[in-house]
Amino acid sequence: NDTSAACGYAPLTPTEEAVLSTEKFINSPAFKLRFPETGEDVKVMGVRAGGQVELTVACAFVARHVRDLADYLAKKEHAAARVRALAASSGFAEAAVGVNVADDPANGSVYLTVTGLSAESGDDGQAGRGNRVGGLITPGRPMTMESAAGKNPVTHVGKLYNIAARLIAERVAAAPGVAEAECTLVSRIGRPIGEPQIAEVRVRT
């Protein structure tokens, strides 16, 4: 197989929960039915300062569902209002949400696409750069640069070990007296997947 290192952790922080729930909300079938102009390419950055969380949302809009600039701005505000309502229920004392904040309406520059994906403008990224198997990019947490989708979809340890490490961490974190758990798995090339070179769990009580 391959030599890979994978990490998992549990539980999610309130900020991580807010970011993940926001992305899932915008990409949910119900939201797309109400706001078909919102594309599938949705990125959410969350920053917390004490009891306040600030969410910056980038959402590619689909041009065929937008009549003109005024219609784009109105539809963006309607969608943003729904996201703000969700953020307000996230448990933070204050939640601020900005959607497509790089828009420059005065110069006719807004986040409008044909497909609803930023890839059409060459922003396709590289394998391994995107979200981890849990749906988040968390630089403040243990993580690996292994691509969950890389190499092959069946036995690639970069996928399997990341999923397994997350499930192990979740199981351990659910144990009485455990506040947080992290798991690291390391595979060794030539050895069966079920025999990791390292299987380490760290807990915080």
What are these regions (language model features)?
Residues P11, G150-Y161:
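Alpha-helix N-cap/helix-initiation motif
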Residues E23-F31, R84, G91, D104, ...:
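Conserved active-site/ligand-binding neighborhood in enzyme cores
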Residues A49-V53, P105-V110, P192-I198:
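A short, glycine/Asx- and small/polar-enriched loop/turn
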Residues V154, L160, P176-T205:
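Structured, hydrophobic secondary-structure cores that serve as assembly/anchoring elements
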